[in-house]
Amino acid sequence: MKGTAASALLIALSATAAQARPVVDERFPYTGPAVPIGDWVDPTINGNGKGFPRLVEPPAVKPATANPRNNVNVISLSYIPKGMHIHYQTPFGLGQLPAVRWGKDPRNLKQHGAGLLSHFQDWSSGRSPGIVQRRRAERHGLHQRSRNTQAAGQGCPMRELPFAWPTEVTISYADELGIILVPTTGRSATTAPVLLFRVAYSGRVQEALARGEIPDQGEVVANRRRNFTAYQHPFRMPGPETGGVGNFWYSFDYGLAHFVSIDGETDFANSPEWNFAEDVTGNETLPSEAETFITDSGPFGNVNGSVHETKSYEQWHLAEAGSGEGRPQQDPVGLRHEPPPYVQFRLFLYQLHVREAFEGLLLSMAWMLTSLGDVCPFFKLVHHPLTLSSATSTGTSSLSSRATAPSILPPCEQQHLLCPQRQVHHPHHQRHGRQH
């Protein structure tokens, strides 16, 4: 059975020649607000003070003056085969194709890459392991720096994490930015968030909040990201280039590490967001209106076999592919992340299902780090390693605790997973935790 069956609403929109066309079930007319922003209590773009707390994201790049003529907001970086994807935006317009100059000397950036929308030309050639690279987004003059990781086989450890690893954006609320992996050793342990996004963290982070923000408020997100189609594009992940699917799951190699990001909401047995095939019983070929919920989604990849068996899903096989026979020698450090569902009321039921789906595979692959979940109070589920032992959950899933369990990457540096804390009370999302 294909994940593009007629009952599936909204499959991955970044389709390629190898991916089937999206199929939409239009039997039941949409009756929601004119602007489908994911909040039926407050259906306005600017917010009417009801419903979800509005999310806030100040510019990642602070303007040099109070009245800037131009400013580029660097939002995210992700590495893809033979290049890098850099997402940045400006409210003033560039007047030319987006471009990046890069090199070792900030005063002489000889290399140049240009592109449109989600791609840049290959700018990976000529880079050497361990060398600090400088880059500048054209039209605003901001210099940034990063250090390349060590090449495979080199024994010296990484002294700094060279990039942020933004993972897939959650489905159930399009404003979710995903998780970010950042260095947290020494003084940077308290200032790491300023390296990426100035957001309203709790008082533990030594960063002054922007005017009008309150602790634990979260981020404010641009209006254009308040629907499914929009969120597929501003936060594009390299699914097609790496054998994955859109923003939902992908993998890549960088330096000594192999990264895998998968979808923690759909595309495995007993996932918290049911796919439509699970409501089709007996002689039915499509779900009835009573069986169709706004939280149903997927599957987004192919399913060869029963939807109740995780190994039937394409996503499981992508994770399995990372455990090839040559992988331990090629990439001795494996890092895998899975964001959980945005709203999950039955926390431990979700843990059980995701462990049943992936635990055996991940342990057999001997991953150095497996991160499962956010720092948000609903699902602090960082485990070392992912295991059915209840001891690993102690202290990491307390609703009253703000601390997170650090993950160690020997001989590299200590890492934390950081995300804004959410406060959600919404009746339409209670079906996430329904019993299978």
Curated annotation (Swiss-Prot):
Protein name: Phosphate-repressible acid phosphatase
Quaternary structure, from the entry: Monomer.
Presence of keyword Membrane: no
Glycan attachment sites: 227, 283, 304
The EC number(s) this enzyme carries: 3.1.3.2
Listed GO MF terms: acid phosphatase activity; metal ion binding
Signal peptide stretch: 1-20
Record keyword Glycoprotein present: yes
InterPro entries: Acid_Pase_Asper, Metallo-depent_PP-like, Purple_acid_Pase-like_N
Broadest EC class assigned to this enzyme: hydrolase
Reactions catalysed, as given in the entry: a phosphate monoester + H2O = an alcohol + phosphate
Keywords: Glycoprotein, Hydrolase, Signal
